[in-house]
From Swiss-Prot:
InterPro entries: Cyt_trans-like, PPAT, Rossmann-like_a/b/a_fold
Catalytic activity from the UniProt record: (R)-4'-phosphopantetheine + ATP + H(+) = 3'-dephospho-CoA + diphosphate
Protein name in UniProt: Phosphopantetheine adenylyltransferase
Record function comment: Reversibly transfers an adenylyl group from ATP to 4'-phosphopantetheine, yielding dephospho-CoA (dPCoA) and pyrophosphate.
Subcellular location field: Cytoplasm
Main location: cytoplasm
Protein residues bound to substrate: 10, 42, 78, 92
EC class of the enzyme, as a word: transferase
Recorded GO MF terms: ATP binding; pantetheine-phosphate adenylyltransferase activity
Length: 163
C-alpha cells in the first residue's frame, strides 16, 4: 500500500523553510502532494495559480523526485482532499511552540473526521525564523528576500516589483 502524504499551505510565497519540510517529507512517504490552499482568512500577495507555478518550479529546480507533485484546493476541509487522493497523513512544519499550539487542535479534529494523522516536522535551524509573512513584509518594504526564498521565487518577486 502506498503511503501518501499532503503538505498543505498557502505558500505565499514559498520559502526555504517550506522547501526544507517538503524535501524531508518526500523522503518519508511514497508520494507527496504539496497542496496550495486558499485561506479565507488571508489576502494573498500572489494569486493561487502563480503560487502553484512557483512551487512546481522550485520543486523541479530542487531536483525532487517525480513522486512529489503540486495541487491546489480552493475550499473545504483538508481531510476531504486527503480522502480524494488516498492520503492518510498531513505534514506540517512547525517553527515554535506557538505553531505546535496552533496545529494541535486541527490535528485532533482531522484525525476525528477522517482518520488522517498529522506529522509535525521541525525546520532546519537556519530557517526556523522564516515565514511567508516575514518575506511579504521585507518585500513590501523593498528589502532583499534572497536569504529566505528559493531563487525562482526571488526572481519572480523582483520581476513583480519592477513590473
Amino acid at each position: 500500500m502506498q503511503r501518501i502524504a499532503v503538505v498543505p499551505g498557502s505558500f505565499d510565497p514559498v520559502t526555504l523553510g517550506h522547501l526544507d519540510v517538503i524535501r524531508r517529507a518526500a523522503r518519508l512517504y511514497d508520494e507527496l502532494v504539496v497542496l496550495v490552499v486558499h485561506n479565507p482568512g488571508k489576502t494573498p500577495m500572489l494569486p493561487l495559480g502563480e503560487r502553484v507555478a512557483l512551487i512546481e518550479r522550485v520543486i523541479r529546480d530542487a531536483g525532487l523526485p517525480d513522486t512529489v507533485r503540486v495541487d491546489s484546493w480552493g475550499a473545504g476541509l483538508l481531510v476531504d482532499y486527503c480522502r480524494q487522493v488516498g492520503a492518510t497523513v498531513l505534514v506540517k512544519g512547525v517553527r515554535s511552540q506557538l505553531d505546535v499550539t496552533y496545529e494541535t487542535p486541527m490535528a485532533l479534529v482531522n484525525r476525528d473526521l477522517a482518520d488522517v494523522e498529522t506529522v509535525l516536522l521541525l525546520p532546519d535551524p537556519a530557517h526556523a525564523h522564516v515565514s511567508s509573512s516575514l518575506v511579504r513584509q521585507v518585500e513590501a518594504l523593498g528589502g532583499d528576500v534572497t536569504p529566505y526564498v528559493p531563487a525562482a521565487v526571488a526572481d519572480a518577486l523582483a520581476v513583480r516589483r519592477a513590473g
